[in-house]
Amino acid sequence: MGQIDGEALHWTRQPQAYKLAQDRIEITTEPGTDLWQRTYYHFRNDNAPLLQMQTDKHFFSFSVKTDFSGSHHRFDQCGVVMYLDSENWLKASVEYENEAYQHLGSVVTNLGYSDWATTRIPASVKTMWYRLSRRDDDYRIECSEDGQSWMQMRICHMAEGQGAVRFGIYACSPEDSSFTAVFSDLQMSECTWIAHDGQQPDEQPTP
């Protein structure tokens, strides 16, 4: 495993404007595109463009570098995604907020309800790496500003993530805006998320 062959990638939802090159992928977002299901906001948005590949491997890691220097409008975002269907997916990205800060966060959607976790980072950050790792039906999302030093963002379980899964990249602009997201260094590797070696599961009582 290593650099992902572009022929392995397929549009789950294709944008109007994009470029596929050997060393980079560009997606130009369209206004009013988003991914969210029900929680708090009570709307269901499911029209963001998605470029994904499929695997039945139960242990792997996928990493990608994102460049969102063209993003200047609230909620503009691009990042890593694992989209199984409209009710079951996860994503991680930086969402632009204003000239002072933006949101580095992840959304996990299980059985039709989205769960958002974020932290503020400076608006001056214009690139971010993400790494998605799978261990059976559990998943970890990490981020990095240099592609070398990684920080855990989230560990989660996917209710429908047991078999073959689709994963890749996405970009969207939920409000009235558009920008060009640039993706590079798409890599697939053996799982970098090692098995837990600390506290063991609770023992089940003997009947």
Placement of each model-derived feature along the sequence:
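Extracellular glycan-recognition regions
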Residues: 1-207
